[in-house]
Amino acid sequence: VADGPADGREWCAAWTAVVDRALTSLAAPVDDGNLAVVAVGGYGRQELCPGSDVDVLILHDGWEEAALQDAVQAIVYPLWDASLKVGYAVRNRKEAVAAVDDLDTATAMLDARMVCGDAGLLRRVGDGVTQRLRKRPARFLDALTAKDDERRAKVGAAAEALEPDLKNGAGGLRDVQSLRWAAGVLLGEVGLDPLVAAGYIGAPDRSRLVRAYDALLTERVATHLESGRGNDALRFDVQDAVARRCGFEDGDGDRDTAAHRLLSEHFLAARTIDHAHGRAWRLITADATTGRRRRRPAQARIDQFEVVDGVLRVPDLVSIDHPDLPHRLLHAMTRSESVLDRRTATRLRNRVDAGEHPWTWDHPTRAQFLSVLWRGSAALGPVAELDDTGVLVALIPQWAAVRGRAQRNPFHRYSLDRHAWHAAAALGDLVRDETWAAVALERIDDREALMLGVLLHDIGKAHGEPHSQTGVPVARDICEHLGCPPRTTERVERLVEHHLLLPDIATRRDLSDAALIIKIAEQ
């Protein structure tokens, strides 16, 4: 298994099987009954990556302490001698059930899998664990939500970081695992299928989630092999080698290397996970708090849309073919801080997939779109919702070239399109939070040009170098597509063409030169 990974899941399954056989062989001489060797955590899911810990529970029913010590030495010590990172716990039935009051132990036990020994013992413990966790699902999910928020704050809350954490980052493997655990506590069965049956995610969502998860698992195996340790961060220094291990090849030019292609695949997979998790999690936690059958959730209505538990729904009687529907959705989601519900997202995605759509641009829709961008960071989530459904590219076809596109540049933190939306959000936040910026904005007679210039400043990076030049015709096409007045279009072109002027001057010229200052001001 050392060479891999053509397929990360196959690699993990093969390595898991090797460890299973070793544990079974080691346990056989000391197993006198009422003993079970149980794989938990990632090992229980059969997702052992090269640098993963092998987490084992030695479960017993009435063994004496001395005999247990002999069993641990026989089962665990040889694996340590083989340089495996083995973590273990020894518990009886009662202890194993009580231990799930600790969140990390609970999540590990939700993925418990029999390796060898007394299967009935594990089954009885599993029933007790499920019963204990299901008594207070809100407590478990509150703790899991806090843990998820903590890890995102630590490693980054954006699914398009240029050095992503494959396990703990937004849209990472842990987000899918959290959904599986939530199903176990709320619905009594761990996995994605129970969430489909209960309506939290759709069958197409499940398929997309599995594909995205498997892509990240393959990346994680390759990253562990290249780094030589359990490092879950896909750092710049290993991206080229990881890309080759994952089967990517170089394209044409410095912006289409194997590593760029790997990162683009990762960004789109992470977005899929991030959106599915965010959409389902609000409903799952609300149902855990108030009861799935007992509660009558509070509803709000914005425009023609319904908002329940932070999830926005377009009622079935409301046509999605209205020319300004996406713009109204964007405005409503921003105003209500909501995400699209599963059915609405599916309707929109199906409409995009059907081909030609009825959504158009004119002065009112363009003004509504830009008014959302001026809301700053509040617009990022709603824009991402339209991106996930394909509506954004349907509205702006030229956006397809930058969607999920990697830019391996230490001066940037995100994918090309995410960088553009963050730049627009930064402008919106600036004028909302800083008085001097708001005053300066009042003196600008074409705010459309300013916002569009910021949004489109790097659009040329998908079309060759120098990107400040290649971006000009693309920006012009987009402005004309949006129906911008010619004067606005010209100003956007100029902003795109000269967006590197000030940073270049600031880093290469004498800023005390009065003549230089006048020259730049005239430009």
Please give the residue ranges for each predicted region.
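Walker B beta-strand of ABC/ABC-like P-loop ATPase nucleotide-binding domains
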Residues: 455
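Catalytic glutamate of the conserved HExxH
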Residues: 458
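A nucleotide- and high-energy phosphate-metabolite-utilizing enzyme signature
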Residues: 1-452, 462-523
